[in-house]
């Protein structure tokens, strides 16, 4: 099982997030409190890239000068940097601060030195707009200086990849809180993420050294994908994991793509767009789906596209039925089910309304009937109240399978676990229940 120390972002992570958010002191007056994240989030991404690349700065500069005459030099520069990204600018944060008068033009030169995949991330976050604002307001030099402090060191030696993900989520949560976002825009605690990962992998990964795919339809900063990959590799160190995710928030999407670049994955698998109306993974099937989609948020904007796809029946994702336009969470559930391989498994967070909303024969009722009659529901776990930032709703973790390995004898047995009193939930707490269910099923199998 996962080391409990890995599950706790820890005091150091909180302190690092505090240091980065304290840059707001340099922004006060020029920016309103709910706008601080527009600067702090992309600057944190830039500084993380900078600190990762700093040890190979001289090597990249040498390689860049040697290969300047070549039209195609990407591979050489990536090899020199040690990452799937690089920066060819002559500047570092340290040398930027040596010329306060030209901080604006020099900082832009530094950002333009990044490889295209990094510049795409920054463009998605509209960072150039904030550079212009800071330059005009006279705070750009101070902000760069703040991020260059020893306490803001985000090199891999100081901040591990997973810990950096926790820091990013902490910053996003503060940004969201300052915006006073809707209850459906929530963030998932590590305990719940690891519970989901542990239950998804409770039966192992199958053949040793297998290749597994993981998909999150509302990935946020992609921490569910990261945790799931780590969990799979703890179960089988030789497993090959490929992550896929879609996100509609440009800031969290930028962070997710940056995280994937730093981890050495394929950033093209992180795709920007509205999952309901613009499915970027149409036709894809995955081994695992893990997600905490928004709930209590209407889908009126996506209605035209969703209804058009629903009219396709079995050829689309939503042919079974449509929920009320006031809450689109069941649409995400249907999307997830449509993305499962025959032996795939999904863990998805829903609030209680998906269990009882709608009269008999209504869209929600037909969705539930479709899932139950196909025996795709494996378990429902009620989570503690106040499990999520910015919402006090009662929530459930639903486990779905497309086709259990034991489908030939497993007949319509889904489980409901009541865990509203659990604090700090994890697989150690849940395992006795899971083992009991497995033992019961094994006994039933012998009797058949």
Which ranges hold each PLM region?
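A short, mixed-charge helix-start or loop-turn motif at secondary-structure junctions
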Residues: 178, 238-239, 317-319
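Soluble or luminal CAZymes and related metallo-dependent hydrolases
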Residues: 15, 19, 248, 328
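Non-catalytic, mostly N-terminal accessory regions of nucleic-acid modification and defense proteins
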Residues: 1-204, 269-277, 382-385, 414, ...
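Short, flexible loop/turn elements at secondary-structure junctions
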Residues: 45, 221, 247-250, 387, ...
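Conserved S-adenosyl-L-methionine
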Residues: 183-291, 295-307, 330, 351-353, ...
């Amino acid at each position: 099982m996962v080391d409990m120390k890995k599950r706790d972002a820890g005091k150091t992570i909180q302190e690092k997030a505090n240091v980065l958010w304290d840059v707001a002191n340099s922004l006060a007056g020029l920016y309103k409190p709910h706008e601080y994240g527009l600067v702090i989030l992309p600057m944190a991404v830039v500084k993380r890239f900078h600190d990762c690349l700093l040890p190979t700065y001289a090597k990249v500069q040498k390689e860049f000068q040697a290969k300047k005459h070549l039209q195609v030099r990407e591979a050489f520069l990536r090899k020199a940097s040690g990452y799937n990204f690089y920066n060819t600018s002559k500047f570092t944060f340290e040398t930027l601060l040596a010329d306060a008068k030209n901080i604006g033009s020099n900082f832009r030169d530094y950002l333009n030195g990044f490889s295209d995949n990094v510049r795409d991330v920054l463009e998605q976050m509209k960072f150039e707009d904030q550079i212009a604002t800071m330059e005009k307001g006279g705070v750009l030099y101070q902000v760069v200086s703040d991020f260059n402090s020893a306490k803001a060191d985000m090199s891999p030696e100081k901040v591990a990849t997973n810990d950096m993900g926790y820091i990013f989520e902490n910053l996003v949560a503060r940004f969201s809180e300052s915006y006073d976002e809707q209850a459906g825009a929530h963030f998932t605690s590590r305990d719940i993420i690891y519970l989901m990962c542990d239950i998804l992998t409770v039966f192992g990964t199958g053949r040793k050294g297998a290749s597994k795919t993981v998909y999150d339809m509302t990935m946020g900063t992609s921490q569910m994908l990261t945790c799931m990959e780590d969990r799979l590799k703890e179960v089988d160190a030789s497993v090959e994991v490929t992550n896929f995710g879609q996100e509609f928030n440009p800031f969290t999407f930028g962070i997710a793509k940056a995280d994937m670049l730093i981890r050495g994955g394929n950033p093209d698998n992180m795709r920007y767009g509205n999952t309901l109306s613009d499915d970027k993974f149409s036709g894809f099937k995955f081994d695992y789906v893990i997600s905490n989609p928004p709930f209590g948020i209407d889908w009126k904007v996506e209605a035209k596209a969703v209804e058009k796809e629903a009219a396709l029946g079995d050829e689309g994702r939503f042919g079974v039925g449509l929920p009320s336009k006031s809450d689109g969470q069941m649409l995400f559930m249907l999307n997830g089910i449509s993305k499962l391989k025959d032996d795939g498994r999904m863990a998805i967070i829903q609030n209680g309304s998906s269990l009882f909303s709608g009269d008999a024969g209504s869209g929600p009722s037909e969705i539930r009937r479709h899932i139950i009659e196909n025996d795709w529901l494996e378990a429902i776990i009620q989570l503690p109240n106040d499990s999520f930032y910015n919402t006090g709703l009662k929530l459930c973790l639903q486990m779905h399978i497309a086709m259990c390995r034991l489908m030939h004898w497993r007949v319509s047995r889904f489980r409901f676990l009541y865990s509203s009193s659990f604090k700090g939930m994890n697989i150690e707490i849940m395992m006795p229940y899971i083992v009991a269910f497995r033992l019961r099923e094994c006994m039933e199998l012998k009797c058949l």
